Amino acid sequence: MKYTKADTAIIKNATIGNGSTIWHYANLYDCKIGENCTVGSYVEIQNNVEIGDNVTVSSHSFICSLVKIEDDVFVGHGVMTINDLHPPSFRRTGSKRDWGSTCIKKGAVIGSNATIFPVTIGENTKIGAGAVVTTDIPPNCVAVGNPAKIIKNKGKP
């Protein structure tokens, strides 16, 4: 695979597609990154994460285990994903049974500083900056706020 990596990036057991760029101080662990992706500076992507093709994960974002990001998604600066519904469940119990998965569908846009709980964000949906997404958001919608509420439902594209 031919991709570009900054000297300061840490990549351990990650699969990275052709044409992708990994910027300074990014940390990638046991994850899969598609083709023509950009992973910004100071991003952490944990194990069991799958990222499709043509995805941008902007600087200072945290993509935790059990997240799937489909093709053509834009993740803004400082976006945080959460998988532990009752922290610190793993430390407390040694079990990941309280963990949930997140799926961000094709063409979605996640605004800067959004927090994404274990949910599904529909195709072509836009999440506003600073939103806290605690429930599934259907396709072709715009959701903003804390907690995130749908303010526009565009229906089928």
For each predicted feature, which ranges?
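Flexible, glycine/small-residue-enriched loop-and-beta-strand segment within the central core
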Residues: 1-7, 12-15, 22-121, 146-147, ...
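C-terminal/domain-terminus segments
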Residues: 122-136, 140
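Conserved active-site beta-strand element of glycosyltransferases/polysaccharide synthases
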Residues: 143
